[in-house]
């Protein structure tokens, strides 16, 4: 079996050494070279032809974003960003995903050996996924036209969306065309803590609806999208006649917290046939069982098609389980969601 060839770009010699040790400890991948800055990396890419690049966000001579933009324009390849956990870097990381990076990991606290095995497995999983991923299509920078289906504001109907690898840009593509009169949306995107607030704030600037990081106990309102906080589960709940957000630190489900299954199951319970469920690009099976529960509760369910997915894992599993009404290309999902809500199809059992 051929190994996945990886090239690391990081100005820290310690991080280059750590990444090399991690990659080479897995029998299905190898670190072919490591570069201290993008200008050195440019020559090493030509020499070693890596399949996956790990790229530091902040570096001398040329920063990670500038290099990524040039790389995706001149020699597109799967890139996993490596970022320190700061507010500034979380915003840069979100921008990197817009430019075409497949995924990202946070830098570990060097010198702390506890948890390094889990960190090694996390990096290896992201490398394997990136090696198989379809490079994402860039979403247009300008705002798309508002959709023609403009449903009346409704506090009963809502949309639940789940995504993983490639999901940040897929979610952006789904939310940007939505009018302010859209029903409420609850969204679980697999993401570590420290990044979801920047993700929500960036979407809020780009969208006509209000997008925010979800807060425990807040009322679910039409025209709003609520993003699950990193490392915390998002659920729908009821408070009298109103929907409410529930955020909690329950155990990981399908190895994930937040978990798409946790969200979808709560929506099946409390919204039933008043909901539309959407499963987007991502590795694994998180969300498949929950979407089936939504389907059985009367919700209308959609899956992103393989051709438009970065990774067709989660949608494939949901389709295989029989919980999907329609399989739709990414750029058609917004229209289909609102069409179903407007026509009342989401209310049919």
Swiss-Prot record:
Post-translational note: Phosphorylated by CheA. Phosphorylation of the N-terminal regulatory domain activates the methylesterase activity.
List of residues that carry 4-aspartylphosphate: 56
Domain Response regulatory: 5-122
Family: Belongs to the CheB family.
Main location: cytoplasm
Entries under InterPro entries matching the protein: CheB-like, CheB_C, CheY-like_superfamily, Sig_transdc_resp-reg_Me-estase, Sig_transdc_resp-reg_receiver
Gene Ontology CC, one term: cytoplasm
Alphabetized SMART domains for the sequence: REC (SM00448)
Compartment annotation: Cytoplasm
UniProt cross-references to Gene3D superfamilies, sorted A to Z: 3.40.50.2300, Methylesterase CheB, C-terminal domain
Reaction catalyzed: [protein]-L-glutamate 5-O-methyl ester + H2O = L-glutamyl-[protein] + methanol + H(+); L-glutaminyl-[protein] + H2O = L-glutamyl-[protein] + NH4(+)
Tagged with keyword rRNA-binding: no
Encoding gene, per UniProt annotation: cheB
Gene Ontology BP terms: chemotaxis
Swiss-Prot/TrEMBL domain comment: Contains a C-terminal catalytic domain, and an N-terminal region which modulates catalytic activity.
Pfam families referenced in this protein's UniProt entry, alphabetically: CheB_methylest, Response_reg
Annotated organism of origin: Yersinia pseudotuberculosis serotype I (strain IP32953)
Active-site residues, Swiss-Prot/TrEMBL: 164, 190, 286
Name assigned to this protein: Protein-glutamate methylesterase/protein-glutamine glutaminase
């Amino acid at each position: 079996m051929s190994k996945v060839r990886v090239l690391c770009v990081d100005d820290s010699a310690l991080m280059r050494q750590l990444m090399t040790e991690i990659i080479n400890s897995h029998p299905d991948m190898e670190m072919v070279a490591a570069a201290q800055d993008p200008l050195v990396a440019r020559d090493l890419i030509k020499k070693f032809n890596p399949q996956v690049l790990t790229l530091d966000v902040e570096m001398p001579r040329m920063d990670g974003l500038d290099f990524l933009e040039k790389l995706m324009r001149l020699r597109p390849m799967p890139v996993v960003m490596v970022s320190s956990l700061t507010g500034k870097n979380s915003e840069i990381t979100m921008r990197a995903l817009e430019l075409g990076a497949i995924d990202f990991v946070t830098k570990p606290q060097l010198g702390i050996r506890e948890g390094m095995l889990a960190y090694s497995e996390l990096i290896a999983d992201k490398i394997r996924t990136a090696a198989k991923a379809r490079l994402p299509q860039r979403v247009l920078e300008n705002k798309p036209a508002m959709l023609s289906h403009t449903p009346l504001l409704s506090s009963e109907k809502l949309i639940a969306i789940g995504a993983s690898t490639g999901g940040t840009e897929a979610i952006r593509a789904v939310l940007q065309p939505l009018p302010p009169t859209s029903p409420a949306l609850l969204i679980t995107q697999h993401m570590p803590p420290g990044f979801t607030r920047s993700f929500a704030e960036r979407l809020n600037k780009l969208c006509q609806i209000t997008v925010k990081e979800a807060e425990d106990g807040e009322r679910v309102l039409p025209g709003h999208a609520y993003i699950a906080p990193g490392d915390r589960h998002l659920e729908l709940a009821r408070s009298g006649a109103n929907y409410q957000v529930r955020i909690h630190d329950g155990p990981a489900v399908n190895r994930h917290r937040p978990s798409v299954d946790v969200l979808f199951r709560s929506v099946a319970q409390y919204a039933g046939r008043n909901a539309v469920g959407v499963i987007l690009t991502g590795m694994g099976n998180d969300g498949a069982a929950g979407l089936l529960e939504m389907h059985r509760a009367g919700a209308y369910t959609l899956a992103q098609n393989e051709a438009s997915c970065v990774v067709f894992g989660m949608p494939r599993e949901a389709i295989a389980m029989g919980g999907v009404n329609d399989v739709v290309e990414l750029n058609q999902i917004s229209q289909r969601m609102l069409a179903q809500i407007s026509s009342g199809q989401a209310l049919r059992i």
